[in-house]
Amino acid sequence: MSSPCLDRLAALSSAEEFFQVLDLPYAPEVLRVARLHILKRMGQYLATTSFAGLDDDAVRRAARDTLERAYRDFATSTPLAERVFKVLREHDPERPPARGAFVPLADILHPLTQS
């Protein structure tokens, strides 16, 4: 089920438009640094929100709340600390890199030495 509010949000193309349509104030310096991170986090929050049975005003309020929550995450933190995107999660200095598969050279040469 779709709502006019969600349809309108899906058609937006800039972070500023989301804030304008949902009538939320924002600091340009926060948005300049974290616009994609904020929208990605908003999408994560929206994905866990049920809109079933809500009228369009309630959907708009829920969308506004998720954008406000996502914005707050980055107004009080940084994209590096939040690690919303996969590339940042994979290169977390706090987490050791995953070890690749190791095959000893003897195991590779073993079939050759049995001829």
From Swiss-Prot:
Domain of life: Bacteria
Gene Ontology BP, a term: nitrogen fixation
Presence of the UniProt keyword Transport in the record: no
InterPro entries: NifW
Keyword list, A-Z: Nitrogen fixation
NCBIfam families xrefs: PRK00810.1
Function: May protect the nitrogenase Fe-Mo protein from oxidative damage.
UniProt record similarity statement: Belongs to the NifW family.
Record text on subunit structure and interactions: Homotrimer; associates with NifD.
Protein name, as recorded: Nitrogenase-stabilizing/protective protein NifW
Species assigned in the record: Methylobacterium sp. (strain 4-46)
Taxon lineage: Bacteria, Pseudomonadati, Pseudomonadota, Alphaproteobacteria, Hyphomicrobiales
Gene that specifies this protein: nifW
